[in-house]
């Protein structure tokens, strides 16, 4: 890869899965609270497409209010996990700018915005939704797993005009004790006011808690195959 990674801090030690062929598309995937990019790089490598590069950055370590101010990998501070919980607006916006810098780095290296999918799990999925909806570049789509839309009251007004064409795959475990599936359903409703409603898929998985499952990963692979075909 050409270009200077030093100007994009999240790229310097990100876990990546390189394409087996010439890379013509990219998936940027953001992990959940307390995790690192390595676990999702491993998971995505099991469904990899040969022409796609997968980039899984690591969140900075910060004190998290929800976890008694313990320092852990977190994209922004979390005060609670409910639709009415107070939110770290400045932290969310700063994190989104850092992800946009990563997107722009890939664009400078020859991958067009419409060949980039942003995704994530839990807090990472939340950040991927907020970032893609407010991004000035028209991305291909979003993979949003077990998550919610941060600062949801700001939408649809906060969305960039190009966001209406985004394809969104939203998946949720029906027994999720951390981010209840009802919160996911409310998020899907809100997303349909921001993007073309038919472009939002909301899939739920019986018996699944706050985690992924093989059926969900198969759905992610199918979604990526449709959005990012070989060129």
From Swiss-Prot:
Covalent S-S links between cysteines: none
UniProt subcellular location: Cytoplasm
Superkingdom of this protein's organism: Eukaryota
Signal sequence interval, chain numbering: none
GO CC, one annotated term: cytosol
Keywords, alphabetical: Cytoplasm, Fatty acid metabolism, Hydrolase, Lipid metabolism, Lipoprotein, Palmitate, Phosphoprotein
Reactions accelerated catalytically: S-hexadecanoyl-L-cysteinyl-[protein] + H2O = L-cysteinyl-[protein] + hexadecanoate + H(+); prostaglandin E2 1-glyceryl ester + H2O = prostaglandin E2 + glycerol + H(+); 1-hexadecanoyl-sn-glycero-3-phosphocholine + H2O = sn-glycerol 3-phosphocholine + hexadecanoate + H(+); 1-octadecanoyl-sn-glycero-3-phosphocholine + H2O = octadecanoate + sn-glycerol 3-phosphocholine + H(+)
Phosphoserine modified-residue sites: 82
Active site: residue positions: 122, 176, 210
Pfam family for this entry, one: Abhydrolase_2
Main enzyme class: hydrolase
GO molecular function terms listed in the Swiss-Prot or TrEMBL record: carboxylic ester hydrolase activity; lysophospholipase activity; palmitoyl-(protein) hydrolase activity
GO biological process: acylglycerol catabolic process; fatty acid metabolic process; prostaglandin catabolic process; protein depalmitoylation
Covalently attached lipid (S-palmitoyl cysteine), positions: 2
Record EC number: 3.1.2.-, 3.1.2.22
Function: Acts as an acyl-protein thioesterase hydrolyzing fatty acids from S-acylated cysteine residues in proteins such as trimeric G alpha proteins, GSDMD, GAP43, ZDHHC6 or HRAS. Deacylates GAP43. Mediates depalmitoylation of ZDHHC6. Has lysophospholipase activity. Hydrolyzes prostaglandin glycerol esters (PG-Gs) in the following order prostaglandin D2-glycerol ester (PGD2-G) > prostaglandin E2 glycerol ester (PGE2-G) > prostaglandin F2-alpha-glycerol ester (PGF2-alpha-G). Hydrolyzes 1-arachidonoylglycerol but not 2-arachidonoylglycerol or arachidonoylethanolamide.
PANTHER family per the UniProt record, alphabetical: ACYL-PROTEIN THIOESTERASE 2, LYSOPHOSPHOLIPASE-RELATED
Family: Belongs to the AB hydrolase superfamily. AB hydrolase 2 family.
Protein's name in the database: Acyl-protein thioesterase 2
């Amino acid at each position: 890869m050409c270009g200077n990674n030093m100007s994009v801090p999240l790229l310097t030690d990100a876990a990546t899965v390189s394409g087996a062929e010439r890379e013509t598309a990219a998936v940027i995937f953001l992990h959940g609270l307390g995790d690192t990019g390595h676990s999702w790089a491993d998971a995505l490598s099991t469904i990899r497409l040969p022409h796609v590069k997968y980039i899984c950055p690591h969140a900075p370590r910060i004190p998290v209010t929800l976890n008694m101010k313990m320092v852990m990998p977190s994209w922004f501070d979390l005060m609670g996990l409910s639709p009415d919980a107070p939110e770290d607006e400045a932290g969310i916006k700063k994190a989104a700018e850092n992800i946009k810098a990563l997107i722009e780095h890939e664009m400078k290296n020859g991958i067009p915005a419409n060949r980039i999918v942003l995704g994530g799990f839990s807090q990472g999925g939340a950040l991927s939704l907020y970032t893609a909806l407010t991004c000035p570049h028209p991305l291909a789509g979003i993979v949003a797993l077990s998550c919610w839309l941060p600062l949801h009251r700001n939408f649809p007004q906060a969305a960039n005009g190009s966001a209406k064409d985004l394809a969104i795959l939203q998946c949720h475990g029906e027994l999720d004790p951390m981010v209840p599936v009802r919160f996911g359903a409310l998020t899907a409703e809100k997303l349909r006011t921001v993007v073309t409603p038919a472009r939002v898929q909301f899939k739920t998985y019986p018996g699944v808690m706050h985690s992924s499952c093989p059926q969900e990963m198969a759905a992610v692979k199918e979604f990526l195959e449709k959005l990012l075909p070989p060129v």
